Amino acid sequence: MLELTTQDIQLQQHFANKQAAIQGLAHALTAKGLVAEGYAQGMLNREAQHSTYLGNGIAIPHGTTDTRELVKQTGVTAMHFPQGLDWGDGNLVYVAIGIAAKSDEHLGILKQLTRVLSADGVEQALQQAKTAQQIIAIIKGEAQLTADFDASLIQLQFPASDMVQMSAVAGGLLKNTGCAENEFVADLVTKAPTHLGRGLWLVASDRAVKRTGMSIVTTANHCEYEQQAVKALIAFSVCNDVHQPLLNTITQCVFEQKQDQLLQADVQQLLNLFSGNAEQTIAQRTIAVGTITEETIAAETVAEPDSARAHTATFRIKNSHGLHARPGAMLVAEAKKFESNIRVSNLDGDGQVVNAKSLMKVIALGVKHNHQLQFTAEGPDAEAALQALGVAINAGLGEG
């Protein structure tokens, strides 16, 4: 059976319009010896008759019955358009598969496509794919498109008395649902959780992870960690980026100081809270398929800036309690207003450089009163971003 392989896919393609893209696909089919000259016109004629857009960011340009004699051998070629290509009627295509069909051997690929056309998150995953292997996995339905989170990953009012117990239970839930193995649980209990405010904590690990998932554990007992209240722990097992929609919900709760909404929710309310944000995020095309390392857990990663084009600014934090959840969220919200890649380091800390648009990473910098933050921005609005961040910091990040 004919199958799409990694050798068939051309990444990072850019065309002015779909007609130019179709001609590019026809040229690739010709170069592979699959079709004779003139097949491109047949593909264009077919597109003029009826759009070959299937849905979920996928199109399948092919010839007409009149051009079948130009097909030397049944085969395919594919192109990836990370910026999206207008295919008409408001449809954006991220992967176009050019088909040269001499018989019905190509039906296997079409059968694969029908399985992903109705799946949530496919279009966003194709947009964000970085490798041919990722695209193949998406088309075959093998890629994880959403993080695992259901009632089996929620444990409310567990009688825990310390953070080790909380981490063990949270890790156990992820292990028992097939997201991770025993080594993950052992690693999780050694991690130092991040306090998100009002007794809500977060911890994550990518050790021995099979699927990305999230668990939530609340405690029925009085519990403290580093002299701060512990009411709930959110744990992530991470092997790709599909947990980002869940992190967006958490970030929004912290930014709006609505941790209590999460802490007081029952199982169904928690499921509704996180599924609602996932749907919104899908609509905004933020789901990504990729890998994540231990150093980038719970953070959106950005490329290292080019020092020749980057802009740098240093600001001193005036907040008496440093960057805890509220001012930290305000800082991240300001950074997210800009397109530029923005990284930040605490010059009075360990000097680690992190993504300024990730609340978890910013809080983890341990910024205290009078610490200096150095921001590096690269992009079309880099100078404006640094200026706005300076204004926000000098204004107290919502704390006056």
From Swiss-Prot:
SUPFAM superfamilies: HPr-like, Phoshotransferase/anion transport protein. It is found in: Cytoplasm. GO terms for biological process: phosphoenolpyruvate-dependent sugar phosphotransferase system. The modification Phosphohistidine is found at H62, H324. Disruption phenotype: Does not affect growth on glucose. Mutant shows a slight growth retardation on fructose. Gene3D superfamilies: HPr-like, Mannitol-specific EII, Chain A. One of its GO terms (cellular component) is plasma membrane. The active site is at H62, H324. Keywords: Cytoplasm, Kinase, Phosphoprotein, Phosphotransferase system, Sugar transport, Transferase, Transport. Residues 2-142 form the PTS EIIA type-2 domain. Residues 310-400 form the HPr domain. The keyword Nucleotidyltransferase does not apply. The PTS EIIA type-2 domain is phosphorylated by phospho-HPr on a histidyl residue. Then, it transfers the phosphoryl group to the PTS EIIB type-2 domain. The phosphoenolpyruvate-dependent sugar phosphotransferase system (sugar PTS), a major carbohydrate active transport system, catalyzes the phosphorylation of incoming sugar substrates concomitantly with their translocation across the cell membrane. The enzyme II FruAB PTS system is involved in fructose transport. This is Multiphosphoryl transfer protein. It comes from Vibrio cholerae serotype O1 (strain ATCC 39315 / El Tor Inaba N16961).
